[in-house]
Regions:
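Short, Lys/Arg-enriched N-terminal segment that forms or immediately precedes the first helix
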Residues: 1-11
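Short helix-coil-helix linker/hinge
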Residues: 12-18
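Short capping segments at the starts of secondary-structure elements
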Residues: 17, 28-32
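A short acidic, leucine-rich amphipathic alpha-helix
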Residues: 22, 35-39, 54
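Residues within helix-turn-helix
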Residues: 33-34, 45
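Beta-hairpin "wing" of winged helix-turn-helix
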Residues: 56-71
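Conserved segment of winged-helix/HTH DNA-binding domains
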Residues: 68-100
Length: 100
């Protein structure tokens, strides 16, 4: 994946207020789907849609934890370190480099 495509994917994932709230919610600790949905004040289904987009962009990573005592699996989500610097000069350089 080119740098310009990677940047576009991250910016797209960050382009929704609910996804920004999810990022703020899991900033300090990983959480499972219900915790995130409850903290953000949205349904599980909507949280899952937004988390999927964040995970696809590499901003969020998930892992499955199986609680043996309860015999159920929970998917935990955690924020991945990221830092985005954008300027017209950087964009021009990356577009020229990628040939797009």
């Amino acid at each position: 994946m080119s740098q310009i495509t990677n940047l576009a994917n991250k910016l797209d994932a960050l382009g929704h207020p609910l996804r920004l709230r999810i990022i703020a919610t899991i900033y300090q600790k990983e959480m499972y789907l219900n915790e995130i949905a409850n903290n953000v004040g949205i349904s599980r289904a909507l949280a899952k849609i937004h988390l999927k987009k964040l995970e696809k962009s590499g901003i969020v990573k998930s892992r499955i934890f199986t609680a043996e005592a309860e015999a159920k699996a929970l998917r935990y989500y955690e924020l991945q370190p990221f830092d985005i610097h954008v300027s017209p000069q950087i964009l021009k350089k990356e577009v020229e480099k990628s040939g797009q």
